[in-house]
Structures are given as structure tokens and as C-alpha cells.
């Protein structure tokens, strides 16, 4: 059966960027059609990404915290793992959120078309669904088609023992020996889950550090905390994987790589994602898509075709849901006639590992590469009352200031709940705040969050919770 729909705005993809664009456009009085290949809204993030991974990370945290309490006088028995119940709980979390999105979509009178959509011209999209095709004629389009996992040619990807992040979240079993190929955020998060559930986890990373985007000192703290949990192989690459009945035999290459093949029960491939620009036939609408699949846009999120916009992973790094949401609002508002540009000073990044790593703005490495005149202030959590009371003193809070003006250029936190704390630094960077603004803000005590204010006091020279390197020297 073939249907035809005419609309003012069509949004291609219903991830965080897509549904946010659709909802914002509807709130601004526009007729909106939202096209999604999945049966539920939310895209990769909600269905097979951000949300289910955080549910499983919560399980991992409870297991690890319970074990850690033994040294503080509280001993629990060995946890009994019921994978069916864990999976069921994870699916309940997803269902609650997707159900909420479905309800909000109906309340806003956004029409959802389920199926895979492709452009057939600069004014039409053809959607192929299980119940037939739908032709959508539009005045404006927003491409929010996201990204896909990258496959490696030397990996037997058709072997069920080789999984990507989606497969890892299915939690079919807990392998005894697991290799995580890629030491980025996704790989480390899933490695954290499987380690807590009982797997021996090895991580191989081609770069000389895990999470290459973060500063080395932040990652070093993570490494030191996890050196007994993971077998980490840096500056190492996988060159071959041989599938045998009893396991996957991996050949490594690198200065510290194992000389012989190593057997694993399962391999998680987490080497990044690629944009889906070519999958939606954007070229048939006249939209320029580069060879990698990215679509170039203006600050208004316009493509080279003025009435077609693009947002999210498909327009470039960083591939983050919160970036996509803000781009979505911008595109919808521009279509409605408002003046709006996507021009953030900073976009936060968080690794929901244990400990968490979070950073925003200019990193110390980037500042040095750019020749910026900076001063770095580090507050060690070994001096934090809350961290000591929580038996988690491994962390630190780091602030990066412009040396002459004191303006906050960036910051990073490593430690428990680092991601929840990062917002203050993000706001400081976005608003152009300086160290005095942050230091004179009264932070509650005892909290981990007060470490941000204390780092600012280090720069200001007013710190009293640590020896003050800027204190006035007294005459003898």
C-alpha cells in the first residue's frame, strides 16, 4: 500500500536530535512528520546506547561498591547474577522512556512514519515500511540520521562471538575471557559492566593512552585505579583474528604486544562510529555529502540546499546526544523564522567509567598546542572530606584558566560522580566566568562539588584547605 503525506517539516531520524527537532518545530506551530526506522522513538541513544548502558553501569557500580565495603566492616555474600532479570530491568528502563516520547509526540500532534526514509528529490522522501511505502512531500527537511558502528575488515564480523556495542548491551552471556578492541569511552564503559559481572577483560588501544581526547593526567588516575581490573595494552593493534571452535585467537602487533596468539571467548569491537549521510540518499536532494558520510552545515544547521537542514552525528564530531539536541532546537527555530545559530563555546564529554572521567572546554594539551597562556589548578580529592568519607580519594578536579585574565577556559574531573559535577565548569566557560566568580561562589560543604570552587581558590591564591603556593612570604 502506498500513502502520500504533505508537511511543512519532515525530520529523518528520531534519536535525541531528531525527536527534539520535531517536538520543537511542533511547539512553534509547524506541521511535522517524524520518520524512524525503529518501532520506538529515541534512536541509538535511548534504545541501544546511552540509556541501556547506564542501566547496566548502575548494576556494575552496585556490585563493585558492595565488594569494596568489605574493608570498611560490611561484608556481603558473592552476588548471584540473574542475566534474565538484569536484561528485563534494562528493557523496562528503555520502555519507560520510549513510552514517554511516544506520548509527547502524540500530544504535540507529530505524525510518526515507521520505516527507512530516503530522499527522492529536494522536496520528497520515500519511506519503506513493513506495511508499504509512504511518499512525503515537504517544505523543509531536517536530516538526523545519526551514525553506525565501524566494522573492521580483518575481524570475522559474522561470528556471534564478535559483538559491537549493541550486541554487548544484549547481555546474552558473561564470557570468561573478553577482549575490548578500542580504548575509547564506549569500550571502557562496556568493559566496566562485563568486568563487574565476572569477565576477565583485556583492552587493546592503538594510541598511547586510553580515551585519547582526555588529558593524560586524568586518564592516568583512571588507569591506576583499574590496573588490577583490566589488562590494558596500549600502542598495540590487532592484526588478525582466527575463529576456532574453542575461541577467537587474536594476533597483536606493537612494542608491548603479546608475542603469541591469545584466545578470547568474546571480542567487543568499539573502534568508533561512522556517519550515515550516504544511507539516506541525500545526494538525490542535491545535498553535499563527503566521502566519509558527513554533511557540512552552517551555524544555522543549513546544508547547501537552503530548505534542508542536518543535525547530530551526521554533521560531525563530537558525536554526542546533547550536542544533537541543541543543534535540533537551532534548526527548528530557524525554520520557524527565528534568528538562531549553533555556536557553543564548549561541549562536555563524559566517560561513565569507574572512576568517571569528564572534561569540557580547552584541555591542557590543546591549550599548549594552541600556544595559549594558561595556568592550571589541580585540587586533589585526597584533601576532600567528602571523598575521604566515601573512601574514594583517587580523584581530582582540574581547572584551566587564562593566566592574565583568570577566565575559565576549561576543566576536567576524574572521580565518582564526575559527570554530575561538570555542569558548573561548563556554565563557567559558556558565560566567560573567571576564577574569582567561581571562587567567591559559596559551595556546600562537605561535597565533591566544592572542589571546583577550591581549584579556583588555588588560582586566586586564597586557598586554605591546602598549602597555598601564592601565600605572602613572611620575613624570618
Region locations from a protein language model:
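Flexible, glycine-rich terminal cap/loop adjacent to redox cofactors
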Residues: 10-17, 21, 26-38, 44, ...
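Short hydrophobic core segments
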Residues: 10-12, 117, 136-146, 180-181, ...
Amino acid at each position: 500500500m502506498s500513502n502520500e503525506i504533505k508537511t511543512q517539516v519532515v525530520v529523518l531520524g528520531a534519536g535525541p536530535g531528531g525527536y527534539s527537532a520535531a517536538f520543537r518545530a511542533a511547539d512553534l506551530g509547524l506541521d511535522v512528520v517524524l520518520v524512524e526506522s525503529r518501532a520506538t522513538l529515541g534512536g541509538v541513544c535511548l534504545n541501544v546506547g546511552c540509556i541501556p548502558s547506564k542501566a547496566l553501569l548502575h548494576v556494575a557500580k552496585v556490585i563493585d561498591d558492595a565488594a569494596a565495603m568489605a574493608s570498611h566492616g560490611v561484608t556481603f555474600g558473592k552476588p548471584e547474577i540473574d542475566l534474565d532479570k538484569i536484561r528485563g530491568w534494562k528493557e523496562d528502563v528503555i520502555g519507560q522512556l520510549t513510552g514517554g516520547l511516544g506520548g509527547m509526540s502524540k500530544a504535540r500532534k507529530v505524525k510518526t512514519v515507521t520505516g527507512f526514509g530516503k530522499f527522492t528529490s529536494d522536496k520528497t522522501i520515500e519511506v519503506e515500511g513493513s506495511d508499504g511505502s509512504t511518499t512525503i512531500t515537504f517544505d523543509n527537511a531536517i536530516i538526523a540520521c545519526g551514525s553506525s558502528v565501524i566494522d573492521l575488515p580483518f575481524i570475522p564480523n559474522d561470528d556471534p562471538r564478535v559483538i559491537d556495542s549493541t550486541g554487548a548491551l544484549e547481555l546474552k552471556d558473561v564470557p570468561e575471557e573478553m577482549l575490548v578492541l578500542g580504548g575509547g569511552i564506549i569500550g571502557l564503559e562496556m568493559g566496566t559492566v562485563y568486568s563487574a559481572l565476572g569477565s576477565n577483560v583485556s583492552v587493546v588501544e592503538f594510541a598511547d593512552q586510553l580515551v585519547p581526547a582526555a588529558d593524560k593526567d586524568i586518564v592516568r588516575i583512571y588507569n591506576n585505579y583499574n590496573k588490577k581490573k583490566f589488562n590494558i595494552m596500549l600502542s598495540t593493534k590487532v592484526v588478525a583474528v582466527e575463529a576456532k571452535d574453542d575461541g577467537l585467537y587474536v594476533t597483536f602487533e606493537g612494542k608491548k604486544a603479546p608475542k603469541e596468539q591469545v584466545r578470547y571467548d568474546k571480542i567487543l569491537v568499539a573502534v568508533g562510529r561512522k556517519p550515515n549521510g550516504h544511507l539516506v540518499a541525500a545526494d538525490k536532494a542535491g545535498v553535499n555529502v563527503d566521502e566519509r558520510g558527513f554533511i557540512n552545515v552552517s551555524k544555522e544547521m543549513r546544508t547547501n540546499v537552503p530548505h534542508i537542514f542536518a543535525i547530530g552525528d551526521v554533521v560531525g564530531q563530537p558525536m554526542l546526544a546533547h550536542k544533537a539536541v541543541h543543534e535540533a532546537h537551532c534548526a527548528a527555530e530557524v525554520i520557524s523564522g527565528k534568528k538562531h545559530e549553533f555556536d557553543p563555546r564548549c561541549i562536555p564529554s563524559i566517560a561513565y567509567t569507574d572512576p568517571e572521567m569528564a572534561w569540557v572546554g580547552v584541555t591542557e594539551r590543546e591549550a599548549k598546542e594552541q600556544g595559549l597562556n594558561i595556568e592550571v589548578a589541580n585540587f586533589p580529592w585526597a584533601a576532600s572530606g567528602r571523598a575521604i568519607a566515601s573512601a574514594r580519594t583517587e580523584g581530582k578536579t582540574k581547572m584551566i584558566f587564562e593566566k592574565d585574565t583568570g577566565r575559565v577556559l576549561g576543566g576536567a574531573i576524574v572521580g565518582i560522580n564526575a559527570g554530575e559535577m561538570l555542569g558548573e565548569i561548563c556554565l563557567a566557560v559558556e558565560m566567560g566566568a573567571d576564577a574569582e566568580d567561581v571562587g567567591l561562589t559559596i559551595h556546600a560543604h562537605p561535597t565533591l562539588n566544592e572542589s571546583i570552587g577550591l581549584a579556583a581558590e588555588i588560582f586566586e591564591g586564597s586557598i586554605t584547605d591546602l598549602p597555598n603556593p601564592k601565600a605572602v612570604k613572611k620575613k624570618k
